[in-house]
């Protein structure tokens, strides 16, 4: 527990193109080495590709992809009497969003398309339909939690 006052969460301003705070947060997640304009270009390019491919609103596809990737439970290691147990715990909403964005980014980076924009567009489109690497990661985490349900009484 920190002894000083609790630091308030910084409010993330909505992005300039879609006026959506989640898109702005995803820009920050995708950004490397402080190059925000490059991250924005990649995301907006991916959104344009999604609009061309599916004909749907890209922000709706993005939010659907996020909701399909958000984990409900995860496992945390807990040491009890010399043994490590994987204890399933519920994920708080802020961490749920952060994990979903991170998994989408990582799954997009592992894809085979040429540009990052194309990879991201493909991953977002697949995640919105309930397929893709990020959704697979979520299912894997849920399976681990289900398999270790017996240790749920070792709550944190």
Curated annotation (Swiss-Prot):
GO molecular function: rRNA binding; structural constituent of ribosome; tRNA binding
Endpoints of the signal sequence: none
A Pfam family of this chain: Ribosomal_S7
Domain of life: Bacteria
PROSITE patterns cross-referenced by the UniProt entry: RIBOSOMAL_S7
A Gene Ontology BP annotation from the UniProt entry: translation
Record-level GO cellular component terms: small ribosomal subunit
Keywords: Ribonucleoprotein, Ribosomal protein, RNA-binding, rRNA-binding, tRNA-binding
SUPFAM superfamilies documented for this protein: Ribosomal protein S7 (SSF47973)
InterPro entries: Ribosomal_uS7, Ribosomal_uS7_bac/org-type, Ribosomal_uS7_CS, Ribosomal_uS7_dom, Ribosomal_uS7_dom_sf
Function: One of the primary rRNA binding proteins, it binds directly to 16S rRNA where it nucleates assembly of the head domain of the 30S subunit. Is located at the subunit interface close to the decoding center, probably blocks exit of the E-site tRNA.
HAMAP family for this protein: Ribosomal_uS7_B (MF_00480_B)
Family label: Belongs to the universal ribosomal protein uS7 family.
Protein name in UniProt: Small ribosomal subunit protein uS7
Organism for this UniProt entry: Nitrosospira multiformis (strain ATCC 25196 / NCIMB 11849 / C 71)
